[in-house]
Amino acid sequence: MINSLLTRVFGSRNERQLRQLNRIVAKINALEPEIEKLSDEQLQAKTPEFKQRIADGEALDKVLPEAFAVCREAGRRVLGMRHYDVQLIGGMVLHLGKIAEMRTGEGKTLVATLPVYLNALEGKGVHVVTVNDYLARRDAAQMGKLYNWLGLSVGVVYPGMPHSDKREAYAADITYGTNNEFGFDYLRDNMALSKADRYQRGLHYAIVDEVDSILIDEARTPLIISGPADDSPELYIRVNRVVPHLVKQEAEDGEGDFWVDEKGKQVHLSEAGMEHAEQLLVEAGILNGETEGLYAAQNLTVVHHLNAALRAHAIYQRDVDYIVRDGEVVIVDEFTGRTLAGRRWSDGLHQAVEAKEGVPVQRENQTLASITFQNLFRMYKKLSGMTGTADTEAFEFQSIYGLEVVVIPTNRPTIRKDSPDQVFLNRKGKFNAVLADIEECAKRGQPVLVGTTSIETSEMLSEHLSKAGVKHEVLNAKQHDREATIVANAGRPGAVTIATNMAGRGTDIVLGGSLEAELHALGEDATDEQKAAVKADWQKRHEAVKAAGGLHIVGTERHESRRIDNQLRGRSGRQGDPGSSRFYLALEDNLLRVFGGERVQKMMRMMGMKEEDVIEDRLVTRMIEKSQRKVEAHNFDIRKNLLDFDDVNNDQRKVIYAQRDELLDAESVKDNVDGIRDDVIFDVVARFVPPNSIDEQWDLRGLEATLESDFGLQMSLTDLVKEHEELDAEAIAAKVQERVNQHFAEKEASVGEETMRALEKHVMLTVLDQSWKEHLARMDYLRQGIYLRGYAQKQPKQEYKKEAFELFSDMLENVKREVVTLLSRVRIRSDEEVQALEAAERQQAEARLSQSQFQHQDVGGYSADEEAAQVQAAQQGVAQMQRDEPKIGRNDPCPCGSGKKYKHCHGQLS
């Protein structure tokens, strides 16, 4: 009651904001007479003037009134369109990083030119995001005339563009493109092997057209780049034939070619084993024995395959670790004994086991990179959006994206008549009424737009209209070019257009048809008389349609979201035109059935209601809207729930991508490698010779074997300790560290500093990328089963955060170990070899991308809704939480032993 009273006195927040913006509109209007007097050259000179003022530190908000006035005058001169006052308000809302709700026909495309022009003056790039390629190209071509006239460059990005053209488009002041293309290019940039391979120059400011469609409707499913793994199935088979000839050692120092670390599930080749394996691989034709060895740089893939094959033969046993069923290797869960259908071991192990068992070696499709639109667009420093329907989702925009919705008043009052819903007993009665309404409108020359929720319904209606002899168009949303043409002509007298609810957005339905399209069809050589004749003919049609009642909207079913229904209604009544709308429903429709439609249907039949009888009451409409609100709230919970999970992945993605950027930008990564090497060697030594331990606790032979197998170092630590009995654990660690550093220094001296720097950078990038891809697969597996923790009285989200952090920490440690191991063992003779290696890697990366699938779909073959429902169901089973361990205070020492406070270490994930 108090809120209502305050609103009546001071106005709503929306009204207060509009009052503030109207004051700035008055300033812009006051500048108009002065700006109008400027010559074209003087007006164009304003752009470099503004740029200089901004470069000198003047805020954009200070430049805004003058910049908007210049853009408005340029629009009048170049496009023949002058921005209305309400369009100036819309432009300011977009500049402020908010969402402008503007009704259909209010000129959103023209509105965007104001904030785009102003923000492009900073020189950091502005992205204008549309829902399809056709609209991106159309808007870039139309509005590009204005921007180019004002001295700004415009680019448009679309799938399949040449690399140089796309880089140029992103380097422009203003770049148009679809949400998918901006997202995929962001992912591609974070798979690039050099700075020159990247497209984008940072995510600075974006204006999202149809923002509700992109940030809400498409928010639940991620963009995924997936492709076949690099491994060749043939190479697995060839290497598999070599492994049976290698002999297993009974002990670490025994005779043979390799020994097995049962606990770590690893296999290590001895020095003799390396020579024997190299000989066998040469005999098999896999290696060229005259010019290359097993650990030559170009043979790292062969080493990877050999290790996988050794593990498959020596560690993984049939009918224990896996079974063979229907020609496939199926993993057996070591704890439950159940088969894990659909799961595959990573790192090439599964293919190696398939080769061992003689079943077809499958080439995996691996997720190379993924991101959700929620996380993509939240990375922009400033984000804004436009749509005709955002107010119903204002809470979600605010809570997830921090975007406030401002409803912009229409330039002219809306006079469209929205009739109450008509509810029928069943679908047959409903569609009979729909067909009768369409035929009646067609007879009196009133255009009709029929909105359906499925292609099946569209085709059924089309069939009935054809039988009745009613001419009509069915809009296929897959053909964007044709879609725009059909929608542009949907306002002609008597036109009947059947479309799915979302089709045709971005193109206005003009009463009488599109005059602009007709004039364009005349061609550039058309005379003034021809143009005048076309305009006169259009004017007659325009008046005829207005007299018939304007565009009539027929909705054949209520959508789950009120916003989608409002979008359909909003196609009619643009710019103060007449229009009407009505929804026809049946108690069998999905929305009504879920909320008790079947029960009501039985009751109505008992009361004698017939098929052709209709319920028409405002109360019914309100009840339906109440049902829609319930569904909207449920869908919001799903999206919010999924975002909580995605945020964990996103935090990790940011760390990895930041590390990649640092590597790509760095001239040298020597300091990074030196630091990593020290950490890795310290950890390796500590495993066999623990700090502050006595010599009885040392495993010097194990340390020697590991240094030899992993780092190619031969050190007789046993003899060293015998000679120097005073050596303690710290001294041994120092000796090993000294020897490793000497080994790296010798390698650098033999190949040259420049070659070594290039190799270090290449190895770090390659290992990081490969580890990240494998980590994504592990995260997918974790996520698919995490909801089951709810049945064990644990919170799935907290469990996911905890285990994801552990997986990520393990991955980072493995990256360090792998980098040092590869750099220790790789043999490089010249700079040309490194360049050849980088060229081969780049070629492989390009091949991966060319074979990749660019998807906007659900991950893992199950829907996002199902996953969220499973999580929610599991969480409902969570009773009062019982801790497995005592609670750790935020200022207590972290139990991991790092010495840091819990809040600064693992507590950061809480």
From Swiss-Prot:
Sorted UniProt keywords = ATP-binding, Cell inner membrane, Cell membrane, Cytoplasm, Membrane, Metal-binding, Nucleotide-binding, Protein transport, Translocase, Translocation, Transport, Zinc
Annotated Low complexity bias = 869-880
Q: Which GO terms describe its biological process?
A: intracellular protein transmembrane transport; protein import; protein targeting; protein transport by the Sec complex
Residues recorded as binding Zn(2+), renumbered to this chain, are 894, 896, 905-906
Tell me the enzyme class. translocase
Q: Which residues bind ATP?
A: 87, 105-109, 508
Give the UniProt subcellular location, in the record's own words. Cell inner membrane; Cytoplasm
Principal location:
membrane
- Name the residue ranges with Basic residues bias: 900-910
The way this protein sits in the membrane is described as: Peripheral membrane protein
Coiled-coil ranges (or none): none
CDD domains per the UniProt record, alphabetical: DEXDc_SecA, SF2_C_secA
* Region described as Disordered: spans on this chain: 848-910
A Gene Ontology cellular component where this protein is annotated is: plasma membrane
* Record-listed E.C. numbers: 7.4.2.8
Catalysed reaction(s) here are: ATP + H2O + cellular proteinSide 1 = ADP + phosphate + cellular proteinSide 2
Q: Which cofactor does it need?
A: Zn(2+)
Pfam families the UniProt entry points to: P-loop_SecA, SEC-C, SecA_DEAD, SecA_PP_bind, SecA_SW
For this chain's record, the cofactor binding note is:
May bind 1 zinc ion per subunit.
The molecular function terms of the Gene Ontology recorded here are: ATP binding; metal ion binding; protein-exporting ATPase activity
Q: Which HAMAP family match?
A: SecA
The family classification in the record reads: Belongs to the SecA family.
Q: How is the quaternary structure described?
A: Monomer and homodimer. Part of the essential Sec protein translocation apparatus which comprises SecA, SecYEG and auxiliary proteins SecDF-YajC and YidC.
Record function comment? Part of the Sec protein translocase complex. Interacts with the SecYEG preprotein conducting channel. Has a central role in coupling the hydrolysis of ATP to the transfer of proteins into and across the cell membrane, serving both as a receptor for the preprotein-SecB complex and as an ATP-driven molecular motor driving the stepwise translocation of polypeptide chains across the membrane.
What name has this protein been given in UniProt?
Answer: Protein translocase subunit SecA
